[in-house]
Amino acid sequence: YMNRGVHEGYEGLVVYHFNSDKNVVEEKAFIPISESYEFLKRDLGKLSYVNEQNELFLLFAQNLYKVDIEGNSYEILEEGIKYDNFVASDNNDHAAWLITEGDSKGCIREIDFDTKKTRTITCEEGQRLRTAGFINEDLVYGILEKSDILTDSNGHRSEGIQTLRIEDFDGNVKKEYHRDGLYITNISVGNTLIEFELSAKSGDTY
């Protein structure tokens, strides 16, 4: 809630810049939102990055924003991003997410925020993709079959990934892991370490 300034009385996110020469705080962008503080804090903790072109990239309310700090403007780069499907590198200069709408629905889109270049990762028919995280600047993602998405009698859904890949922005596969007859579950990606469990399918669960 804005309690002063040009947007007093409105709810939104404001980007300020401190001008050391003038010793004043300047408003650079105002993005109206209705999201609660708790969700806003969670989303901004996922991504907040400024590149050398003085462009700020933020994720909140399921949208990826680019704020032009010098131009006092903003634009939405992607809409409908689910929080759990969005991953960013440790220093936030790369990010990837599962596309949820349009012709590329189900694919993964990755972006380099310094160059603003993007790439799209596709899968074969009957397969599904899942973002897992980053090892340095390399994307970690999983490939699973649609038939390996299980729902038990209580309505709980579980997924078993068949192949886990580490891939750089140019599409070069750095490492790939697969075990016949077993499924990769409970994946945790740290800065330099990937942990997961190998599970067997048992009825409608793993």
Model-inferred region functions:
Residues 1-16, 45-60, 92-102, 132-152, ...:
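Short beta-strand elements that form the blades of beta-propeller/WD-repeat-like
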Residues 6-39, 59-79, 103-125, 151-181, ...:
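Surface-exposed loop/turn elements that mediate protein-protein interactions on large endomembrane-trafficking
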Residues 33-49, 79-91, 125-137, 178-191:
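Repeated scaffold domains used in trafficking and secretory/extracellular systems
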Residues 81-144:
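Long amphipathic alpha-helical scaffold regions
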